[in-house]
From Swiss-Prot:
Modification Phosphoserine, positions: 389
Required cofactor(s): Mg(2+); Mn(2+)
Protein name per its UniProtKB record: Isocitrate dehydrogenase [NADP] cytoplasmic
Binding sites annotated in the UniProt record for substrate: 77, 94-100, 109, 132, 212
Primary localisation category: cytoplasm
GO biological process annotation, one example: isocitrate metabolic process
Keyword Signal: no
Record PTM: Acetylation at Lys-374 dramatically reduces catalytic activity.
Modified residues (N-acetylserine): 2
One Gene Ontology molecular-function label: isocitrate dehydrogenase (NADP+) activity
UniProt source species: Microtus mexicanus (Mexican vole)
Superkingdom to which the source organism belongs: Eukaryota
Gene giving rise to this polypeptide: IDH1
UniProt modified residues of type N6-succinyllysine: 126, 400
Amino acid sequence: MSKKIHGGSVVEMQGDEMTRIIWELIKEKLILPYVELDLHSYDLGIENRDATNDQVTKDAAEAIKKYNVGVKCATITPDEKRVEEFKLKQMWKSPNGTIRNILGGTVFREAIICKNIPRLVTGWVKPIIIGRHAYGDQYRATDFVVPGPGKVEITFTPKDGSQKVTYLVHSFEEGGGVAMGMYNQDKSIEDFAHSSFQMALSKGWPLYLSTKNTILKKYDGRFKDIFQEIYDKQYKSQFEAQKIWYEHRLIDDMVAQAMKSEGGFIWACKNYDGDVQSDSVAQGYGSLGMMTSVLICPDGKTVEAEAAHGTVTRHYRMHQKGQETSTNPIASIFAWSRGLAHRARLDNNTELSFFAKALEEVCIETIEAGFMTKDLAACIKGLPNVQRSDYLNTFEFMDKLGENLKAKLAQAKL
């Protein structure tokens, strides 16, 4: 490869701790030597978020809206300890949540699979991509303890002043209990549906929506109906052209089906189900260090990619003391590759598309050739049995990936 590939506009968000160090290494060794990017950089490190009163996070989200592609490093979401550690002005919200609220869209998690890394669910040979509808339901519910006997009712008061409607939830006759009122909005469910259909089309895999509409006939039934209506009107012919399909499944049936399957599908989950199943599926594949997270907006055009893990604080503390670390960079590299692949699709850029694919192949081929970080060696041998010769440290592994990428691209006729 003799010349740099022209890559176009990408919004890049720097993060915190060990992942911030890895992020810079990825740019320096794997991206910028080969791709000429119009980079719009935003420092989402906790100190800068504090200094800008979190305005930098909002600015980054607006930039993603404008340029359609964002790649994000893992960031600290502060708790009380972090507020004290960094002497923060306040406990700033999760940057991921802020960005998601501005962009809308659905977060899809996907495992990165290597043949030599054992999976807890051995039958999963292809990824299962989980899309979580991260809005409403239990997460925006009003719940309370019922102090004693009495009635719990839900009332809807129309804005136009017409007749109120009241429903009896439960009559507490002996003692109290607990009660909850939760909601969702058609617009949010519609956006969730569009993002899910767009994801299925981009991967060329079937899509399943899981609900419990047999019990929550009106509530979950609404999800089922909206998905079906949008599919029939706007996506059915595109799905059939790709020989893929959309189906609604009951959540219990879907969980059992997923366990028996070989993977290779998109699973659209309601908020709580997605929260639970995404972690369950991640563990089934073996490692959160090998899990990507992509936010897809309903327009199918705007995408933000990141690793599904945190900032690897424990390794950062070791690094600060000058101790050796072996931190897995793969999910962070895939944030870049997925972002660049999307940029390539938008711009019809075959060279950039080839590069993004080559970068992912190099990561998998390097691990399958036996060069890996300590966490992956532990997946294979069990942590107590891992010796120093079984793995590379953070910087050695990045160098190895850099060397292998250089060799792969040298063979390519670009």
